[in-house]
From Swiss-Prot:
The keyword Calcium does not apply. The modification N-acetylmethionine is found at M1. It holds the Pfam family WD40. This is mRNA export factor rae-1. Disulfide bonds: none annotated. Keywords: Acetylation, Cell projection, mRNA transport, Nuclear pore complex, Nucleus, Protein transport, Repeat, Synapse, Translocation, Transport, WD repeat. Belongs to the WD repeat rae1 family.
Length: 373
């Protein structure tokens, strides 16, 4: 289903180094050899992403509800430097790196998608919707490149970057509901909608819908992440997280329906006033080498899972605030997650000061356990 073909002409931005701004002190070490990144925004961090390159000195970017997007450089196992920051006049809902890490796309609540050129430190509007832009993903195809944005205006739009500063829309897909979450692992794209349906697209010849899958989850979808097949070569399916403390594992082309399943997570171990406390799954990431996954929740914990063995690998101790978003570095060595208020208890529940960013060494924690004979 997911091979290769053409769609437009490939356009290259080219690569350049980031211009260095003020440097923050070295990160502070926390328990279990985790590392606290200095200079986190005050407001809730909505999205956090490692850069694709370079492997030895990756960068880290986060977008916040206060409209700030920040970039750090990872120098060694204990030291992070703040490199750059931009202030956007709207909450930031998503970000996406370009493949050479020279630029970042920004999805904003003011109905605009922006591009931040790190070398020139300039920000330009590259796409516009009729509602808040909830998701953005850079598609680096075999024969074309473009930005994919999903919005509360019930559309998925694709933008050509060759004619900047002019906005050039390559395609638009009308959807039955608002976009709540999306992911891209070329040539697959998945888009989770407010009606709990997931649209699956093949991107090889331009965006072509190949499936409409109804979620196994009964409650609102919060996050979605694509996983590869067991050979770790091609995209095979996706995992969904919901506000009900549950994850669904769904294959796109499933030989055995029993391969699709759900599991409970991010719930209190003890009953509270006779009831179990249930927390939202705020983000999901797959390990690039092991194929295992990490979930983070409003309970302030992260948990690591082996979906093939259907076992839990690890659950963290509780943090004092919800975990709002996460990412795993392409080397598989590091998990980054953000702490902050996730608004699950409304305005009156916002008593937690500021946000925090933590780096966790995860390559051993996320390694599948040997099967018992």
């Amino acid at each position: 289903m997911f091979g290769s073909s053409g769609f437009g002409n490939k356009s290259m931005f080219g690569g350049s180094n980031i211009s260095t701004s003020t440097t923050t002190p070295a990160a502070n070490t926390t328990q279990n050899d985790d590392f606290l990144v200095d200079g986190a925004p005050e407001d809730t961090i909505q999205v956090i992403k490692f850069s694709p390159t370079p492997q030895d000195k990756p960068m880290l970017a986060c977008g916040s509800w206060d409209g700030t997007i920040r970039v750090w450089m990872f120098n060694d196992a204990n030291t992070f430097e703040g490199k750059a920051q931009q202030n956007i006049p709207a909450p930031i809902l998503d970000i996406a790196w370009i493949e050479d890490s020279s630029k970042i796309f920004i999805a904003c609540a003011d109905k605009e998608a922006r591009l931040w050129d790190l070398a020139s430190n300039q920000v330009a509007v590259v796409g516009t919707h009729d509602g808040p832009v909830k998701t953005c993903h850079w598609i680096n195809g075999n024969n074309y490149q473009c930005l994919m944005t999903g919005s509360f205006d019930k559309t998925l739009r694709f933008w050509d970057m060759k004619n900047l500063p002019n906005q050039t829309q390559m395609a638009q897909i009308q959807l039955p509901e608002r976009v709540y979450a999306a992911d891209v692992l070329y040539p697959m794209a998945v888009v989770a909608l407010a009606n709990k349906h997931i649209k699956v697209y093949n991107l090889e010849n331009g965006p072509t819908e190949v499936k409409d899958i109804e979620s196994q989850l009964k409650f609102q979808i919060r996050c979605i992440s694509i996983f590869k097949d067991k050979s770790n070569q091609n995209p095979a399916g996706f995992a969904l997280g919901s506000i009900e403390g549950r994850v669904a594992v769904q294959y796109v082309d499933v030989a055995n329906p029993k391969d699709n399943f759900t599991f409970k997570c991010h719930r209190s171990a003890e009953l509270v006033n006779g009831f179990q406390e249930i927390y939202a799954v705020n983000d999901i990431c797959f390990h690039p080498q092991h194929g295992t996954l990490v979930t983070i929740g409003s309970d302030g914990r992260y948990s690591m899972w082996d979906k093939d063995a259907r076992t839990k690998l690890k659950t963290s101790e509780p943090h004092p605030m919800p975990l709002t978003c996460c990412d795993v570095h392409s080397s598989g060595a590091f998990l980054v997650y953000a702490l902050g208020y996730d608004w699950s208890r409304g305005h009156e529940g916002n008593t937690q000061p500021g946000s925090k960013i933590v780096i966790h060494k995860c390559i051993e924690d996320m390694k599948p356990r040997p099967t018992k004979k």
